[in-house]
Design a protein with these regions (language model features):
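Active-site-adjacent structural elements in enzyme catalytic cores
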Residues: 1-184
Length: 184
């Protein structure tokens, strides 16, 4: 079995997978598995109220959310994907409060990282992706660092390397403001 198949199997069975993204390593799980989401939040020491990002292997995974925005905004969002840009979109798929942080929105991205996109594509839909770090600590940028900190806490570490970005993704709102800006 290939590494990506092991990772997908872990996700489908409610596990947590560490994997590389554009600028940092991430922790992923099935967005419909409340137990897995709780585990990620516990591992990170992260508050449920912050919400989590969903990454998708293709733009079509976010069609329902994109139907809720203006045609001009949809063009802008689609032009930024795949890319290092997360967008705060209407929660059209009714993801749980564990994903949305209790808001009526969902953070969505199609990453500019082939392995991260492929993980979602092989899974068959969006997956949770949050930085592999303890809340308030620096994001991890190497597989060795992830193995040192998370090997006993996750179900699978997908071998790989981050892309060329310098940190976590930019986070954009529909009104044009930026909640987080990355140098990458």
């Amino acid at each position: 079995m290939e590494n990506i198949e092991y990772a997908v199997s872990a996700l489908r069975s409610g596990g947590i997978v560490a994997h590389a993204t554009e600028g940092v390593w991430g922790l992923s799980c099935d967005p419909k598995s409340e137990q897995s989401i709780k585990r990620i939040l516990e591992i990170k020491g992260r508050s449920k109220s912050k919400g989590l990002i969903l990454i998708g292997g293709k733009i079509g995974y976010f069609d329902q959310e994109l139907l809720c925005v203006t045609p001009d905004k949809r063009i802008e969002i689609e032009a930024s994907w795949p890319g290092h840009h997360t967008w705060i979109l209407p929660n059209a798929n009714n993801y749980s409060d564990w994903i949305t942080g209790g808001r009526e929105t969902t953070a969505c991205r199609v990453p500019n990282h082939e392995q991260a996109r492929n993980l979602s594509l092989q899974f068959g839909g969006p997956i949770v992706s949050t930085s592999a770090n303890l809340s308030g600590s620096p994001e991890l940028k190497s597989e060795d660092a992830v193995r040192n900190d998370f090997e006993t806490l996750v179900d699978f570490i997908l071998p790989g390397a981050i892309g060329g970005a310098n940190g976590p993704s930019n986070i954009h709102t529909l009104d044009g403001s930026m909640l987080r800006s990355s140098l990458g």
